[in-house]
């Protein structure tokens, strides 16, 4: 299911009233090394003899999550959800230029412009979402804006959570945890390619 489709499914489930089946969603962006993501793209460019690396925008940022962390989030959601939550992990951000420097430090970077529909930064919790968001420690959970099965307090008590501050939002450009060039190299070797080398 798409993100929008998943959220509509949850909303419909909540509106239709109590039943045995429960739905929740996980939201975590791109997985490190997944098909079409920037890490294998840069590695392939470098290894095929590119003389430069294309960067859509020098200020672009993204959240960073490994496949293992994504699976852990899914398992957490399965084991802990009341139903209707959207679970979001607390994960570091990276700058696209730092990924390029981690993979091919000697290649120049050329800005080519953002593609249609592409975002400069990744936003996983908007200010509007935050009005229904609680902090679970390692994760956030956006609660249903309309919930017939459980009250807001039920979710807070079930997850032993606290409400996020007013005006909170969770975006890759304002994150407080950041990957460095060196940490990206370590994670590429650990999660993407054990034979990764700097060239």
Where are these regions (language model features)?
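Single conserved hydrophobic/aromatic residue that forms the stacking wall/gate
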Residues: 1-5, 9-10
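Active-site-proximal cofactor/substrate-binding loop regions of enzyme domains
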Residues: 6, 15-17
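Hydrophobic alpha-helical interface/terminus motif in multipass membrane transporters
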Residues: 10-12, 42
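A conserved pocket-lining segment of Rossmann-fold NAD(P)-dependent short-chain dehydrogenase/reductase
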Residues: 18-30, 41-65, 69, 73-92, ...
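Mid/C-terminal beta-alpha module of Rossmann-like enzyme folds, strongest
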Residues: 77-149, 163, 176, 182-199
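Short helix/strand-capping connector loops at secondary-structure junctions
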Residues: 161-173
């Amino acid at each position: 299911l798409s993100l929008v489709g998943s959220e509509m499914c949850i909303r419909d489930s909540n509106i239709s009233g109590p039943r045995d089946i429960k739905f929740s969603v996980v939201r975590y962006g791109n997985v490190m090394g997944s098909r079409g993501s920037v890490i294998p793209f840069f590695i392939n460019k470098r290894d095929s003899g590119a003389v430069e690396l294309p960067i859509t925008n020098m200020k672009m940022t993204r959240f960073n999550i490994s496949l293992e962390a994504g699976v852990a989030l899914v398992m957490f959601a399965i084991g802990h959800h009341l139903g209707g939550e959207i679970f979001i992990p607390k994960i570091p951000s990276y700058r696209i230029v730092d990924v390029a420097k981690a993979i091919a430090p000697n290649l120049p970077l050329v800005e080519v412009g953002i593609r249609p529909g592409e975002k400069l930064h990744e936003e996983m919790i908007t200010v509007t979402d935050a009005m229904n968001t609680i902090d679970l420690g390692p994760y956030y959970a956006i609660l249903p804006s309309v919930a017939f099965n459980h009250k807001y307090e039920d979710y807070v008590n079930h997850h032993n959570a606290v409400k996020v501050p007013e005006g909170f939002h969770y975006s890759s450009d304002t994150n407080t945890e950041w990957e460095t060039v060196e940490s990206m190299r370590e994670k590429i070797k650990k999660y993407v390619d054990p034979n990764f080398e700097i060239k």
